[in-house]
Amino acid sequence: YVSGSKGATLVTHAESVALIKKHGRKATPELKTYTPAAGMPTYDTIRAKVVKEYTDAGFSAANVWLQSFNYPDVAYWVKNSGDFGKQAVFLDGNYTDGTTVGMDESVPSKPIGIPNFVAYNAAGFNYIAPPMQMLLKNDNGKLAVSDYAKAAKAAGMHIITWTLERSGPLAK
């Protein structure tokens, strides 16, 4: 929060990467949706710059999981970023219960229920990251592995998740 902090400045992504490296940490940067305007860098330039800033700081790809909800971001990294692409994480914004089967084939980044993990894997995607409710189900009062998680593992996908999805005020 800069507005309320007199004299404060935001760090650049490269400065943030240098701090992470200095403290011996691993990184999971998320590339947000970017809409370039006239005179702004292209989307591919931004995708490449993220990787370059980690390599310039001396990061091994083994310590960086690039992530995005945007299918083309992950596809770009897989195709153009060597070992960094092998660890790129496709964030699944699907918020069903992990049992509904189907996929909007016209929009591969918008799965409905259980995505086509075999196709993701064939495209070079190795990591999927859905919200927690996609990985677990209630099986007669007992916690069980969801169909989504079983399908992802069967296709050879690595799974990373987050524990809290918050789309509105916490008071709700």
What are these regions (language model features)?
Residues 38, 44, 87-172:
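C-terminal active-site rim and adjoining tail of enzyme catalytic domains
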Residues 1-75, 79, 83-96, 123, ...:
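Metal-dependent phosphodiesterase/phospholipase catalytic core, i.e.
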